[in-house]
């Protein structure tokens, strides 16, 4: 059973996150291992396994990138274990330039410049995310997979910038 079915949701990117949360809580109550403490060893093991599956499904579907990756996996794109890389040279050059800019910001310890950088990267991420949503809605799986690969780069860059922000605030 796929994760969408487990939570009673349609297998598409745009989901009702409130319904996801309610169903998660319901499933957790239903299959919590403590409810099977007096059961057989087989029942206890099954409850632990089911609870682990529910938690994994919840973690996967609640985050936009992992939800997209999972949806793509249902359509034959295993992005989690693939060795495929982004082939868009212009995008890769832009990422290199942004990484260099972040390094410069780290050296200069310029808070205002870092704040501007984070906002810019977030805007880039949001634009790509919207592009990916449209691609998934239109079942453009190849294009969506490529966009997810690019979103991973932007997500890592955003995370690095936010870590730098925390580091600069600690001084």
From Swiss-Prot:
Top-level division of the source organism's lineage: Bacteria
Domain (J) ranges: 2-74
UniProt cross-references to InterPro entries, sorted A to Z: DnaJ_domain, HscB, HscB_C_sf, HscB_oligo_C, J_dom_sf
Family the UniProt entry places it in: Belongs to the HscB family.
Function noted in UniProt: Co-chaperone involved in the maturation of iron-sulfur cluster-containing proteins. Seems to help targeting proteins to be folded toward HscA.
Subunit structure: Interacts with HscA and stimulates its ATPase activity. Interacts with IscU.
The name this protein goes by in its record: Co-chaperone protein HscB
Organism classification: Bacteria, Pseudomonadati, Pseudomonadota, Gammaproteobacteria, Enterobacterales
């Amino acid at each position: 059973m796929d994760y969408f079915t487990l939570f009673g949701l349609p297998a598409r990117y745009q989901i009702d996150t409130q319904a996801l949360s309610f169903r998660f809580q319901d499933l957790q109550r239903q299959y919590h291992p403590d409810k099977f403490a007096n059961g057989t060893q087989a029942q206890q093991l099954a409850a632990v396994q089911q609870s682990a599956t529910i938690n994994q499904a919840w973690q996967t579907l609640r985050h936009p990138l992992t939800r997209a990756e999972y949806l793509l996996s249902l359509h034959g794109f295993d992005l989690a274990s693939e060795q495929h890389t982004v082939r868009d040279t212009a995008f890769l050059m832009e990422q290199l330039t942004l990484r260099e800019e972040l390094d410069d910001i780290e050296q200069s310890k310029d808070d205002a410049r870092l704040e501007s950088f984070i906002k810019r990267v977030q805007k880039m991420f949001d634009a790509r995310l919207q592009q990916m949503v449209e691609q998934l809605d239109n079942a453009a799986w190849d294009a969506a997979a490529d966009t997810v690969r690019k979103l991973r780069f932007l997500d890592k860059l955003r995370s690095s910038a936010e870590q730098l922000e925390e580091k600069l605030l600690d001084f």
